[in-house]
């Protein structure tokens, strides 16, 4: 899915923000013309990366690092002390991603205990989700806004605070 999304993104520069548009104008459709860059289409191709010798950079959609291809990459790399794992974005409580950024020394992946020797980094500024102000702006542009919102995403305190904010600022049931 990420490969397809990347292809769509590369063919729609009119949707880029100012910074990305400047890069596109500089490099054109060669924006990702990086030597040895490979996209994997199947889970099997992705797992084969772990069998390749030598150093590598694996970019994977991690989500909360609880399911999918990322588990194979973590299982095969967390124990390497010369490995670094960069987790981009928020990680919910109770998830593998949260345990890693909080410094767990061992995790269970696919039934196997894996020692964490890799360096773990968290880049908090990345998110595929709109923030509170972006959601309020989106709501403000609706021609016929709904009579009520159901806030179902996020940890309880943040979701509850956002629901209160919706009610206070917009007079909308949430």
Please report, for each region that a protein language model flagged, where it lies by residue:
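Acidic/His-rich, metal-assisted hydrolase cores and their charged scaffolds
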Residues: 1-174
């Amino acid at each position: 899915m990420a490969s397809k999304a990347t292809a769509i993104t590369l063919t729609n520069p009119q949707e880029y923000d100012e910074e990305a548009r400047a890069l596109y104008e500089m490099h054109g459709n060669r924006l990702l013309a990086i030597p040895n860059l490979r996209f994997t289409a199947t889970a099997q191709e992705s797992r084969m990366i772990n069998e390749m010798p030598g150093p590598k950079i694996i970019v994977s959609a991690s989500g909360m690092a609880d399911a999918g291809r990322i588990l194979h990459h973590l299982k095969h790399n967390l124990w390497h002390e010369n490995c670094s794992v960069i987790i981009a974005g928020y990680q919910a409580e109770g998830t593998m991603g949260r345990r890693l950024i909080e410094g767990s020394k061992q995790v269970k992946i696919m039934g196997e205990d894996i020692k964490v020797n890799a360096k773990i980094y968290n880049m908090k500024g990345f998110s595929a989700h709109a923030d509170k102000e972006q959601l309020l702006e989106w709501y403000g542009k609706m021609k016929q806004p709904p009579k009520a919102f159901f806030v179902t995403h996020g940890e309880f305190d943040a979701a509850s605070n956002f629901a209160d904010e919706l009610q206070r600022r917009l007079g909308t049931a949430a």
